[in-house]
Amino acid sequence: MAEDEIVVEEEQSQPQEITPVPPSSSSSPSLVVEDDDEMKLKHLEFIQVAAVYFAACFSTLYELAKDNAGPLKLGVENIEDCVRTVLAPLYEKFHDVPFKLLLFVDRKVDDVFFDVETYVPSLVKQASSQALTVATEVQRTGVVDTTKSIARSVRDKYEPAAEYYAATLWRLLNQLPLFPEVAHLVIPTAFYWSEKYNDAVRYVGDRDYFGAEYLPMIPIEKISDILEQDQCRAD
């Protein structure tokens, strides 16, 4: 009996083998999601989207031009094969470098935002948000009137200088051969459409349309005076 008890005790004292439990399938998707989040752009994703859109447009235009190349299409395809053979190894090696650089800059932007959130006091943030709210609630009429006054002052200041340089340029062009003959044919049409343009500007100005104050008028009368003076000098 003693021997049997010793054998039983030895069997119980032997360490049990622990079989490793394979990771459940539910844990692997979380790792994949984390990897995907690490490879996503947070702030500069619009640059990636614009690059993809530009590449798609360029590829479409290139294929359209190649299809319409006619007899040159075969030569273009041969050049494509040569370029593909030379640049394929470089592309395989460096094709992800631009995205990694963009990802690096994106993470730096994220770090800057984190630092700002850390060091800027909450009162300053609150004041900034209140200032933004007040700015968005400013009456449109006040802003438009201010902009109108600025535009009017700029126009009154630079319009005489523009007229002077335009007159000087006109006199220089009149010295060119055949220019006066061509000008006499073109000027009536130009005056007609200039008058139509001025009528349109007056129309939108009388109805107080937004932006009408910024549209300049063509000084047809002053241009006519310059032409008459030049004609009198020529005679």
From Swiss-Prot:
<dbReference type="Pfam" id="PF05755">
    <property type="entry name" value="REF"/>
</dbReference>
<dbReference type="GO" id="GO:0005811">
    <property type="term" value="C:lipid droplet"/>
</dbReference>
<protein>
    <recommendedName>
        <fullName>REF/SRPP-like protein At2g47780</fullName>
    </recommendedName>
</protein>
<feature type="compositionally biased region" description="Acidic residues">
    <location>
        <begin position="1"/>
        <end position="12"/>
    </location>
</feature>
<comment type="similarity">
    <text>Belongs to the REF/SRPP family.</text>
</comment>
<feature type="region of interest" description="Disordered">
    <location>
        <begin position="1"/>
        <end position="32"/>
    </location>
</feature>
<dbReference type="GO" id="GO:0034389">
    <property type="term" value="P:lipid droplet organization"/>
</dbReference>
<dbReference type="GO" id="GO:1902584">
    <property type="term" value="P:positive regulation of response to water deprivation"/>
</dbReference>
<dbReference type="InterPro" id="IPR008802">
    <property type="entry name" value="REF"/>
</dbReference>
<dbReference type="GO" id="GO:0045927">
    <property type="term" value="P:positive regulation of growth"/>
</dbReference>
<dbReference type="GO" id="GO:0080186">
    <property type="term" value="P:developmental vegetative growth"/>
</dbReference>
